[in-house]
């Protein structure tokens, strides 16, 4: 008996005549109305039974099924709320993508810190689960992008004090949740005898609880999770992760009903994809030229009913499972593969296109980290599938079809992102193919396949798909074993966001201190105040002083701390840093002002004013960037400073000079308009409802009420920093430069106020210095510099030409050169004390004459070699260089036709060249 068995013995099950049974196939316990049922109903224990025989009497579209669900729960006392974005890192910092509706309410609502937007509530939340990517297309039921229809209730135990959590008491719990599920099925005309409720305890994120999988006609249509436990080393319940758990004060109904699967159930199509993407599937089939006879179509449908057996989470070998399906269908497995694999690719393309539409529509920009990396991975896999199956429709068109269906307004930006990424991918493949060839040569002739970890690194670092590696490896005699869950393994490397490090141990005195009253929010321009010293912590260097109230701003949100002084009587101490810990502000000082002393504080006013101007200017630059570049632009990081500041934004290409000028123009127009900058502290749910999650450009603040900064009517953000009162106080904003931080993230460096004037003067000084050096007017510097550059390039080309002529002359003249016969081929051994370009040119000249070239140089006090080999000659240049370089204390290598290397021992150069003929002969014989 499991520890949680009692949790599943519901009054509702007893009242409705359910029986608890154990599946003889998988061992799962389940509840059913059917006394004769033996199996749990879930694949692979049972197959899909609704294909060509829908589970509901009426066929629903996606929108119709969504409305039926939400309306049902509205009629049963739930409030409908709008869905959140698929990029969960816009309101939380511990995950990247929204994978379930409960993500919308973690961690603040689920922990009881803030109330839910409604209680109970219902929602249909778009989600993306990267771990399902390898199942998409194969199982007939998996989609990477999906909508999780859900209803939630947030409860606390009655004995808990009312003010301890943001909600109190019980709304409803397990019996009502199962009854709602049953009644929903009944309202849609389902055969209730065919529904099974499988016990499957849930564990995740340090929480746990009983959970029920709801199976109907072979398909899992819902999961009912009852989150009521937390990890506890002294807990009474051991869960499937091996940890023990105990019950919490809060308990939450967390349900998930897959919209796509419910729609599929109502239509009874061969796979979920025909139900979800009917137009896209038809378009892709026609474009790819996929047509089936009536007999082939019947075989495909028969195979579809068994496709649930291909789930990589349940089988060790997908192809072996496909072979078993072929045996059951009495068809050759190769014939089955010919029919279904093109369809599996079609299904995956449709699903991935929808996933990309969600990602780019919600503002994710492709990059090498975080959500941007995941988007890039999906796009590149989709592009590979499109090319393999021979679809000639542009990928941006396929994604746009889904973006239009989803109602996104930024479709032009979405298409441009896709086109830009395709161009980058082509360049990546050109560079990466050479890497794969070298790797394949390394493993060719060995008994070892190219390891999975190497495949993952090739994909991560070079974007090279595993099937491309397999193709190149096969050509060169190497083998590759691509795991069935390859893309899920890639996603696992990037799925988790970086969490905060564990908090340091706290002094008991510190834990007893009250939160510091922050005066700077009441008057951001004020720099003087009075306070009482509550405590002083002595450090190895300096002191941390805690006051009852402060005007000093602590470092946070990319804004440096204020500095200044504290004065107690005749004693004045310098405040050199300010930090905040759990609401307590710590003033780092160079001396002890005395615990219990009354102090006067003086903030450095010039520093504060410059930081205020730069912080508000950061908001202006961000707003201007969205105006100029598009609404997909979001903050990726920021740092305010005294002389300049920077704003990192997510954008898919380099910012042009014209765009920089337009960003400056928009920002300075707001400065000239002198609009008010005001703050407010609204309820979090109300703020999110009114302004959306673009509020959180600089991170997600804690608390039920959050501070919003409004810049006129143009921009609103959650922000804890100090700001000017009106934009006119900034004076001016000047963009100093832009640069790529990483792929998909652009940095805008700018200055505001007096710092902008100083930066402009520094630029002008540099221009005037250049004008004096060139002896021209400052306005003529660009033209003069360009002329000088062209002349310099011309002379460089002349020098290169002369070097080539000299190399040819040396090659033909035989200066310091020895010719030897190596297996019927002439090899030239030559010493030439020139630079690397001269060595390469001379070697190339010999190779052009059909000769093996070994050219050495002792210039600059070291030895270097270049080896060139003509086509068709069985000598490996890389091995020759490696042997020779070792004789001068170094190393080197390269491809078989051209290699270079060297070492520090120039005195050994001649001996190495003398040995070159023997080296060539030994390697040729080997």
Swiss-Prot record:
GO terms for cellular component: cytoplasm. GO terms for biological process: alanyl-tRNA aminoacylation. It is an enzyme of class 6 (ligase). It catalyses: tRNA(Ala) + L-alanine + ATP = L-alanyl-tRNA(Ala) + AMP + diphosphate. Zn(2+) binds at residues 615, 619, 719, 723. Keywords: Aminoacyl-tRNA synthetase, ATP-binding, Cytoplasm, Ligase, Metal-binding, Nucleotide-binding, Protein biosynthesis, RNA-binding, tRNA-binding, Zinc. It is found in: Cytoplasm. Its EC number is 6.1.1.7. Residues 887-910 are annotated as: Disordered. Its cofactor is Zn(2+). Binds 1 zinc ion per subunit. GO terms for molecular function: alanine-tRNA ligase activity; aminoacyl-tRNA deacylase activity; ATP binding; tRNA binding; zinc ion binding. Residues 888-904 have a biased composition (Gly residues). SUPFAM superfamilies: Class II aaRS and biotin synthetases, Putative anticodon-binding domain of alanyl-tRNA synthetase (AlaRS), ThrRS/AlaRS common domain, Translation proteins. It holds the Pfam family tRNA-synt_2c. PANTHER family: ALANINE--TRNA LIGASE, CYTOPLASMIC (PTHR11777:SF9), ALANYL-TRNA SYNTHETASE (PTHR11777). HAMAP family: Ala_tRNA_synth_A. Belongs to the class-II aminoacyl-tRNA synthetase family. NCBIfam families: A-tRNA_syn_arch, alaS. Catalyzes the attachment of alanine to tRNA(Ala) in a two-step reaction: alanine is first activated by ATP to form Ala-AMP and then transferred to the acceptor end of tRNA(Ala). Also edits incorrectly charged Ser-tRNA(Ala) and Gly-tRNA(Ala) via its editing domain. Consists of three domains; the N-terminal catalytic domain, the editing domain and the C-terminal C-Ala domain. The editing domain removes incorrectly charged amino acids, while the C-Ala domain, along with tRNA(Ala), serves as a bridge to cooperatively bring together the editing and aminoacylation centers thus stimulating deacylation of misacylated tRNAs. This is Alanine--tRNA ligase. It comes from Halorubrum lacusprofundi (strain ATCC 49239 / DSM 5036 / JCM 8891 / ACAM 34).
């Amino acid at each position: 008996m499991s520890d949680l068995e009692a949790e599943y013995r519901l009054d509702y099950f007893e009242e409705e005549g359910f029986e608890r049974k154990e599946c003889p196939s998988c061992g799962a316990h389940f509840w059913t109305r059917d006394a004769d049922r033996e199996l749990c109903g879930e694949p692979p224990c049972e197959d899909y039974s609704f294909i060509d025989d829908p589970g509901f009497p009426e066929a629903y579209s996606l929108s119709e099924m969504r409305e039926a669900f939400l309306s049902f729960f509205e009629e049963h006392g739930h409030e409908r709320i709008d869905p959140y974005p698929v990029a969960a890192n816009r309101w939380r910092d511990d995950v990247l993508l929204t994978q379930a509706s409960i993500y919308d309410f973690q961690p603040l609502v689920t922990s009881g810190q803030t109330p839910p937007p409604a209680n109970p509530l219902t929602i249909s939340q778009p989600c993306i689960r990267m771990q399902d990517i390898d199942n998409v297309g194969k199982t007939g039921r998996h989609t990477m992008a999906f909508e999780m229809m859900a209803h939630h209730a947030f409860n606390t135990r009655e004995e808990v004090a009312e003010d301890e959590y943001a909600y109190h008491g019980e709304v409803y719990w397990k019996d009502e949740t199962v009854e709602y599920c049953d009644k929903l099925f009944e309202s849609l005309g389902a055969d209730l005898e065919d529904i099974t409720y499988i016990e499957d305890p849930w564990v995740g994120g340090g929480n746990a609880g009983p959970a029920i999988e709801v199976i109907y006609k072979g398909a899992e249509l819902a999961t009912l999770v009852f989150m009521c436990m937390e990890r506890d080393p002294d807990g009474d319940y051991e869960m499937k992760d091996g940890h023990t758990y105990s019950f919490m004060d809060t308990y939450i109904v967390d349900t998930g009903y897959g919209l796509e699967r419910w729609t599929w159930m109502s239509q009874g199509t061969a796979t979920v994809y025909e139900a979800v993407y009917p137009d896209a599937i038809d378009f892709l089939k026609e474009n790819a030229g996929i047509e089936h006879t009536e007999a082939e179509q019947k075989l495909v449908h028969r195979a579809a009913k068994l496709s649930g057996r291909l789930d990589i989470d349940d089988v060790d070998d997908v192809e072996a499972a496909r072979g078993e399906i072929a045996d059951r269908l009495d068809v050759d497995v190769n014939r089955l593969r010919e029919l279904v694999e093109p369809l599996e690719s079609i299904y995956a393309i449709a699903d991935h296109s929808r996933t990309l539409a969600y990602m780019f529509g919600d503002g994710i920009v492709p990059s090498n980290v975080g959500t941007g990396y995941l988007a890039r991975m999906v796009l590149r896999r989709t592009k590979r599938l499109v090319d393999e199956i021979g679809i000639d429709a542009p990928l941006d068109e396929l994604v746009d079809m889904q973006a239009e269906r989803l109602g996104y307004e930024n479709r032009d930006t979405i298409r441009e992102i896709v086109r830009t990424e395709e161009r980058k991918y082509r360049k990546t493949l050109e560079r990466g193919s050479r890497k794969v060839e070298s790797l394949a040569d390394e493993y060719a002739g060995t008994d070892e396949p190219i390891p999975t970890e190497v495949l993952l690194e090739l994909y991560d670092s070079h974007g090279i798909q595993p099937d491309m590696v397999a193709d190149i490896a096969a050509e060169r005699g190497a083998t590759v074993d691509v795991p069935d869950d390859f893309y899920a393994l890639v996603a696992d490397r990037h799925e988790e966001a970086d969490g905060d490090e564990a908090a340091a141990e706290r002094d008991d005195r510190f834990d007893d201190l009250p939160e510091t009253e922050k005066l700077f929010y009441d008057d951001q321009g004020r720099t003087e105040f009075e306070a009482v010293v509550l405590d002083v912590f002595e450090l190895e260097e300096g002191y941390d002083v805690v006051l009852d109230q402060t005007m000093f701003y602590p470092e946070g949100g990319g804004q440096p701390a204020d500095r200044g002084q504290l004065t107690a009587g005749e004693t004045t101490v310098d405040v050199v840093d300010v930090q905040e810990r759990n609401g307590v502000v710590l003033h780092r000082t160079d001396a002890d002002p005395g615990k219990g002393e009354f102090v006067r504080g003086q903030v450095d006013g010039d520093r504060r004013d410059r930081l205020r101007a730069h912080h508000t200017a950061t908001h202006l630059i961000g707003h201007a960037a969205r105006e100029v570049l598009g609404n997909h632009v979001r903050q990726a990081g920021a740092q305010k400073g005294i002389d300049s500041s920077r704003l990192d934004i997510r954008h898919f290409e380099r910012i042009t000079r014209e765009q920089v000028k337009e960003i400056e123009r928009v920002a300075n127009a707001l400065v000239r308009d002198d609009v008010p900058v005001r703050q407010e502290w609204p309820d979090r749910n109300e703020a999110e409802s009114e302004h959306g999650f673009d509020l959180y450009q600089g991170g997600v603040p804690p608390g039920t009420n959050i501070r919003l900064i409004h810049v006129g009517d143009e921009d609103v953000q959650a922000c804890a920093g100090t700001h000017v009162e009106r934009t006119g106080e900034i004076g001016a904003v000047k963009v100093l430069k832009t640069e790529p931080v990483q792929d998909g993230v652009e940095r805008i460096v700018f200055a505001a106020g007096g710092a902008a004037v100083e930066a402009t003067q520094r630029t002008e000084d540099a221009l005037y210095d250049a004008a004096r050096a060139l002896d021209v007017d400052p306005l003529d510097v660009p033209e003069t510099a360009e002329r000088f550059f062209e002349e310099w390039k011309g002379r460089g080309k002349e020098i290169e030409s002369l070097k080539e002529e000299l190399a040819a002359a040396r090659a033909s003249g035989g200066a310091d050169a020895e010719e030897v016969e190596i297996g019927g081929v002439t090899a030239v051994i030559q010493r030439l004390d020139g630079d690397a370009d001269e060595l390469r040119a001379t070697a190339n000249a010999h190779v052009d004459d059909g000769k093996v070239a070994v050219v050495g140089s002792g210039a600059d006090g070291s030895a270097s070699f270049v080896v060139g080999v003509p086509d068709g000659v069985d000598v490996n240049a890389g091995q020759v260089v490696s042997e020779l370089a070792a004789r001068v204390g170094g190393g080197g290598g390269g491809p078989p036709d051209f290699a270079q290397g060297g070492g520090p021992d120039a005195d050994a150069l001649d001996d190495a060249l003398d040995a070159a003929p023997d080296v060539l002969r030994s390697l040729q014989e080997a």
